[in-house]
């Protein structure tokens, strides 16, 4: 049983599965990393300022999944699609303006970049690029935006990295806002992971005499008419309600997150003298339609500011339970079908899509399920090939807003067949791997016999390990480069 419970604005949790997962990873700052990626900051707030990217779309639930074609800069994602790697669930990451994304402070010189891997496949290399000194931060990211000579290259040696690792890189000198592009080239697929990192170099922040930042207004969600949002101001003794500023959401315009953020910052500046909100410029604080820092007067005795909400209509709890998904399916003569039972808590719309390892959609289903009801769903795959597959489940509320999504993994396996007589082959793959040469015949996992190709392709026949299977006969992504199928 797979259950997706909602708490507050829904945090999905699923029962663990024994099946494998696809290679995934992202640039993080959980330990010693200097800056997290744009996608990671959609899900995880910064540890020092609690800032987080907003309106990211589905990638906020899967920051590890910004995967696209490899070969950058010669090939790879198209200009304008570099930040998303042309992945649909990351499309929002391609938005590019000077004030769209949270920026992390950085200095030129030696810096630590940290990667977190949810599946640590063999690696060809990591490369780091940075935007040119004269780049345009209000134009879509393109190859012309970047210095295409990587400032840091780390050899992966075609081995599996640990689940978390760091790279020491010498960051070039820059001023102000720049974007770093970190590319992880996976060694056993034709894909790479693209992580853009928004950074701000020292020397660009204004010195604000007698003021220190104590919090910020982050437009995390839209509100409804009748709700309110307010500041919670703390001094050494605890919360001091005398400095509280509250904004009532009294019309449809204010329901939009960027609008109430601007309005609350403006109201703080009108009502308070020891607090001010907005961007500092020319000796004044100017509210913006986005994230607004909140500053405290240095001698005020105030320590920090948090944001609170009065929600007139409680956010409903949603959950979706998925029963019937097996970890493995045997491929037979009929198309493979997944027989599932979906059970909902709360009125919701469920969207299910099955993908193979190469992210080709093979089956889909969409339907509304009422609170407490169950729905029987059969997903018949358009093709059945051995290997890793994914069931992606999306939950939407009654307004059509994406609540959350989750990926469940399963495998298809070839039907057991009677192997041919042993005299017709030299080895059962991968036995005797080091002795494979041109003409060597092996019995593969699909029950068929494969023969190692002549030179110069015969060298691929011995390139195999449990974590690097691209040349494995029958199932490897590039097996036809190494082998000829004989029966």
Curated annotation (Swiss-Prot):
**CDD domains from the UniProt entry:** LPMO_AA10
Residues annotated as region Disordered? 61-80
- InterPro entries per the record? Cellulose/chitin-bd_N, GbpA_2, GbpA_D3, GlcNAc-bd_A, GlcNAc_Chitin_IntDeg, Ig_E-set
Q: Tell me if Membrane is a UniProt keyword of this record.
A: no
Where does the secretion signal sit in this chain?
1-23
Main localization of the protein described in the UniProt heading: secreted
Q: Which UniProt keywords apply?
A: Chitin-binding, Secreted, Signal
Where is each Chitin-binding type-4 domain found? 24-201
Give the UniProt subcellular location, in the record's own words: Secreted
Q: Which Pfam families does the record match to this protein?
A: GbpA_2 (PF18416), GbpA_D3 (PF21868), LPMO_10 (PF03067)
GO terms, molecular function: chitin binding
* Gene Ontology cellular component annotations, sorted alphabetically: extracellular region
Where would you find the membrane-spanning parts of this chain?
Answer: none
Task: Tell me the ranges covered by the Chitin-binding type-3 domain, including all copies.
Answer: 438-479
What NCBIfam families does its record include?
PRK13211.1 (NF009690)
Family recorded in the similarity comment: Belongs to the GbpA family.
HAMAP family, sorted = GbpA
The record describes the protein's role as:
Probably interacts with GlcNAc residues. May promote attachment to both epithelial cell surfaces and chitin.
**PANTHER family reported for this sequence:** CHITIN-BINDING TYPE-4 DOMAIN-CONTAINING PROTEIN, GLCNAC-BINDING PROTEIN A
What's the protein name? GlcNAc-binding protein A
């Amino acid at each position: 049983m797979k259950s997706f419970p909602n708490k507050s604005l829904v945090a999905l949790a699923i029962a663990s599965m024994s099946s494998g997962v696809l290679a995934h990873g992202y640039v993080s700052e959980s330990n010693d990393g200097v800056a997290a990626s744009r996608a990671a900051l959609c899900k995880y707030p910064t540890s020092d300022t609690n800032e987080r990217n907003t309106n990211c779309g589905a990638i906020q639930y899967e920051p590890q999944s910004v995967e696209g074609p490899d070969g950058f800069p010669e090939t790879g994602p198209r200009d304008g699609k570099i930040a998303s790697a042309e992945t649909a669930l990351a499309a929002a990451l391609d938005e590019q303006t000077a004030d769209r994304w949270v920026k992390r402070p950085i200095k030129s010189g030696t810096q630590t970049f940290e990667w977190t891997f949810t599946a640590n496949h063999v690696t060809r290399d990591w490369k780091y690029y940075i935007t040119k000194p004269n780049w345009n931060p209000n134009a879509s990211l393109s190859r012309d935006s970047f210095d295409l000579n990587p400032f840091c290259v780390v050899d992966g040696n075609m081995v599996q990295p640990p689940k978390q690792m760091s790279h020491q890189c010498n960051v070039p000198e820059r001023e102000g806002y720049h974007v770093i592009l970190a590319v992880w080239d996976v060694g056993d697929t034709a894909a790479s992971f693209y992580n853009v990192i928004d950074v701000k170099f020292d020397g660009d922040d204004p010195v604000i005499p007698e003021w220190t930042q104590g919090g910020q207004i982050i437009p995390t969600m839209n509100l409804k008419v009748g709700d309110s949002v307010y500041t919670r101001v703390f001094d050494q003794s605890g919360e001091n309600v005398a400095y509280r500023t509250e904004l009532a959401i009294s019309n449809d315009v204010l329901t939009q997150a960027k609008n109430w953020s601007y309005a609350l910052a403006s109201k703080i500046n009108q009502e308070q003298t020891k607090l001010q909100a907005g961007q500092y410029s020319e000796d004044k604080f100017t509210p913006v339609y986005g994230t607004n820092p909140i500053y405290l007067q240095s001698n005020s005795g105030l320590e920090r500011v948090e944001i609170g909400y009065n929600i007139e209509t409680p956010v409903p709890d949603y959950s979706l339970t998925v029963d019937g998904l097996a970890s493995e399916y045997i491929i037979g003569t009929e198309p493979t079908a997944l027989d599932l039972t979906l059970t909902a808590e709360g009125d919701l719309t469920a969207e299910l899509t099955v993908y193979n390892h190469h992210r080709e959609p093979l089956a889909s289903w969409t339907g509304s399920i009422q609170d407490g009801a169950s729905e029987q769903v059969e997903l018949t795959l358009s093709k059945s090939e051995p290997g890793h597959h994914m069931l992606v489940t999306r939950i939407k509320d009654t307004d059509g807003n994406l609540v959350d999504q989750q990926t469940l993994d399963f495998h298809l396996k070839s039907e057991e067949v009677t192997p041919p007589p042993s005299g017709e082959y030299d080895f059962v793959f991968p036995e005797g791997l080091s002795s494979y040469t041109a003409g060597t015949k092996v019995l593969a996992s699909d029950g068929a016999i494969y023969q190692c190709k002549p030179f110069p392709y015969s060298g691929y026949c011995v390139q195999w390990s449990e974590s690097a299977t691209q040349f494995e006969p029958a199932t490897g992504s590039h097996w036809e480069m190494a082998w000829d199928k004989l029966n």
